[in-house]
């Protein structure tokens, strides 16, 4: 029983039904978000019971979230729009692989769960080709199921990889010592990923009669929940620009991959005590920052400096921050647990590149970050939606940033979404021992993105962040005492 695949298809009344998507769903990055939950298996759990548990988990989850059984397809119109459709030959897919078996153990070369834990679950051991399969990116006309899960058994752990997909994108594989969830933005955003995984975790616990943690997921009309500002124009969106001919949609990087070498994903950690100290230092010259504001300002300064950006070539640096806009919406209000996308626009802070070495940087940068986050309100979302509905294509505009080779950064702010507090049940170690995320196809591609994770088990309120750059940049960060005063490198 080395490999088993099960497809959970929609019931006949659902076949042919369509979920219409809204403008923010259409503009959301068409790339994969893969989340990794590292869970430790109980010593006496059997392979048969794991298979039964994860099969039941998916079966129950798709009853609560039917859109997990949809397929992402093109609407075949001139606007390059997507939709979610219930098809009779597709659905949510679960694959179980036992990498402890004689036939498959040679394909898993990274040892036990303890070995991964000792290395802090490094990205270079999270190989997608090992942990999820079934999509050929060259098959352009093949529809992609919304949810695919692969449960990978390794010594001492289960690598459960779940992914929500989108059409015409490369298929993402993940590696982790326990569980990986993967979400594509067309299906839902980061909070939607959490809602999906919370539902899976609830059914994985297998004690629903004692469960009181149900989340009231709201399946509102995605196509109409945002009222577009039809009077908005592109000049009202300085953080967006038209896509140039031949340019890839929402890909703010320009480089020849053959010229790059030594690319790495590094994990850094800042303790709860150091976060407090950092806030104290910044508060001496300005309003006391939140932990997120302080950490974002710190990362922004030291990463840009480590990249040796030439101020004469790039006089300004931008920092984009992801924002969940649900609570900021009005007319109509958007429910806290709305299923869909409220991930655009990003908050964008700006600073002169020459200012990154000034003594006043932290006070100025913190103010810029705070102001940028506050500016992502209902009006900002409605302006973006209004421009999108007027454009000839949903893919006609892109972020007005240059993350490579330019100086701009994006921080994906997941630290306030309680992924690491999800309880998978005692057989799966309760809460995960680590949480990892990949967004898009990051292998061999520096893209100026940082991911800030929620606190790990045993870390208190300390936070891990992932940075992906070439080795020379990371080496300069590691040699920067102003950075290592706060952050330690884990992998």
Predicted features along the sequence, with ranges:
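Non-catalytic N-terminal regions of enzymes
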Residues: 1-234, 276, 280, 291-311, ...
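Hydrophobic, mid-to-C-terminal alpha-helical segments
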Residues: 286-351
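Acyl/amide activation-and-transfer machinery of modular secondary-metabolite enzymes
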Residues: 28-41, 81-108, 258-265, 325-368, ...
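Helical lid/core segments from catalytic subdomains that handle acyl or acyl-like groups
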Residues: 263, 340-424
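Flexible, P/S/T/G-rich "lid" or insertion loops adjacent to the active sites of thioester-utilizing
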Residues: 230-287
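Short Gly/Pro-enriched turn/cap motifs at secondary-structure boundaries
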Residues: 136-139, 257-259, 399-401
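Amphipathic alpha-helical protein-protein interaction segments
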Residues: 47-51, 176, 186, 193, ...
